[in-house]
Amino acid sequence: MTSTTTAAHGNLWGHPKGLYICFGTELWERFSFYGMKYLLLLYLTKYHLFSDAAGLGVLGSYASLVYAMPVLGGLIADRFIGMRKAVTFGGLLLVAGHLGMAFEGEAARQTSDGVLRDEQALSIFYLSLALIVVGVGFLKPNISTVVGKLYPEGDARRDAGFT
């Protein structure tokens, strides 16, 4: 009888099914961030021939914006669009940003006049990076709120849903 009651409420292993979707989404976003963080410098310095200082500047800007944008994304969600729409919009921006990262253009070449880079590819790269940053800004602060809303007020399982 307990298993039919659990299934009727849309639970899986004692928690709402939506928790696992939120968990998978958060896992994907964190994998994206840490993977990008470690590969970005190599990509910029080896493929586009940025100096170490310039590559670290882009990496530092990316990392700081990823941590700063959730303040703005949470504010916009709270005041204007709501948390579910913010999570969806953030996820779509993240997908678009990662799809844009698939376009790499031509590798930079060292010439006697300096470094010759594919400026169109770099423009797409920066746009894609911006889409990822804004996507994280909408997704990150609001997905935790969605997890909290999956449980009724006072539900003993609520704390376990965040761990």
Describe the function of each predicted region:
Residues 1-26, 30, 109-123:
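Cytosolic juxtamembrane N-terminal segment immediately preceding the first transmembrane helix
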Residues 38-58:
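Short amphipathic helix-loop junctions that connect adjacent transmembrane helices
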Residues 17, 54-55, 89, 154-163:
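Cytoplasmic loop-to-transmembrane helix junctions
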Residues 138-152:
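Intracellular juxtamembrane helix-capping segments at the cytosolic ends
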Residues 79-95, 154-158:
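Cytoplasmic membrane-interface "Motif A"-like loop-to-helix N-cap segments
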Residues 88-120:
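C-terminal ends and interior cores of transmembrane alpha-helices
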Residues 28-39, 43-45, 139:
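Conserved extracellular-gate-facing transmembrane-helix segments in secondary transporters
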Residues 37, 60-79, 95, 127, ...:
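Central cavity-lining transmembrane alpha-helices of secondary-active solute carriers
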